[in-house]
């Protein structure tokens, strides 16, 4: 289950065979009714159940996996959803619809016998080497927020295609979506990657990327914007959206 800004992607697998791949679209009118992303939880959960019913898929699963949220930095891997994770995503300083993934998975799994809820490779996976954290100010350090799930899945597919193990390879992997992140993968760990949410790297369909520092400082002190408005701008209303009025590439 992958909740995104305007859609909820859902897939059903029997072993490794895909049974259903569906991108459930949410209109702007639908989402405008909800003041916060967490208010959208019943809408997205009900849409998933409705889709399964329409496709005639029995509501019987061994595991349900949701997209990981913006909690605390952790190593890559698969994590079982627990009460601490649910609390941390609900109270996270940065609210994003990815925080709903573990909640939807947990709610659906709770209705089933012997079904567990998990997340895998969330966006806050942090395996950066110490040198990669250094930036131009000793009062700051670089943080890791990136498309870990897609990058690592793509890297593993590539390794399988060439008959190698991901943990034996050195790779550069790029994710191109609403945000763009480019990671250095060294023997199964991503030791350097740009922060694709907070303004590092190339601008993208929705994100500002790296901006001229002095101009950004002047923008902050212009009195025209609040802190929250500027954070929303660099994280979702910049890039092609700001230039062209659309993120449709």
Stretches found by the model and what they are:
Residues 1-39:
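Short glycine-rich, Thr/Ser-proximal phosphate-binding strand/loop in the N-terminal lobe
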Residues 63-66, 116-122, 172-174, 192-194:
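General beta-strand structural signal in soluble alpha/beta enzymes
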Residues 222-249:
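A mobile "lid/hinge" subdomain adjacent to the ATP/sugar-phosphate binding pocket shared
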Residues 93-154:
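Gly/Ser/Thr-rich active-site cleft segment
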Residues 13-18, 77-88, 114, 133-138, ...:
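A glycine- and small-aliphatic-rich helix-loop capping segment at beta-alpha/alpha-beta transitions
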Residues 132-222:
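Glycine-rich phosphate-binding loop of actin/hexokinase-like ATP-binding domains
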Residues 52-97, 124-135:
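Short beta-strand-loop/turn "lid" adjacent to the catalytic site in phosphate-handling enzymes
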């Amino acid at each position: 289950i992958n909740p995104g800004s305007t859609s909820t992607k859902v897939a059903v697998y029997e072993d490794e065979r895909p049974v259903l791949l569906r991108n459930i679209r949410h209109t702007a009118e639908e989402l405008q009714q909800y003041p916060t992303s967490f208010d959208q939880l019943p809408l997205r959960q009900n849409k998933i159940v409705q889709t399964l019913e329409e496709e005639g898929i029995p509501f019987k699963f061994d595991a349900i996996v949701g997209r990981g949220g913006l909690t605390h930095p952790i190593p890559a891997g698969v994590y079982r959803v627990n009460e601490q994770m649910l609390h941390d995503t609900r109270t996270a300083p940065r609210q994003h619809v990815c925080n709903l993934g573990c909640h939807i998975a947990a709610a659906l799994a709770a209705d089933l016998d012997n079904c567990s809820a998990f997340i895998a490779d969330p966006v806050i996976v942090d395996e950066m080497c110490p040198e990669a954290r250094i930036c131009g100010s000793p009062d700051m350090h670089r943080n890791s927020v990136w498309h870990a799930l897609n990058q690592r899945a793509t890297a593993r597919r590539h390794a399988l295609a060439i008959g190698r193990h991901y943990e034996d390879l050195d790779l550069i992997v790029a994710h191109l979506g609403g945000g763009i992140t480019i990671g250095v993968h060294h023997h199964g760990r991503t030791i350097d990657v740009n922060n694709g949410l907070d303004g590092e790297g190339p601008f993208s369909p929705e994100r500002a990327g790296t901006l001229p520092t002095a101009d950004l400082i002047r923008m902050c002190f212009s009195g025209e914007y609040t802190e929250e408005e500027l954070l929303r701008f660099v994280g979702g209303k910049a890039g092609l959206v700001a230039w062209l009025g659309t993120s449709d590439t």
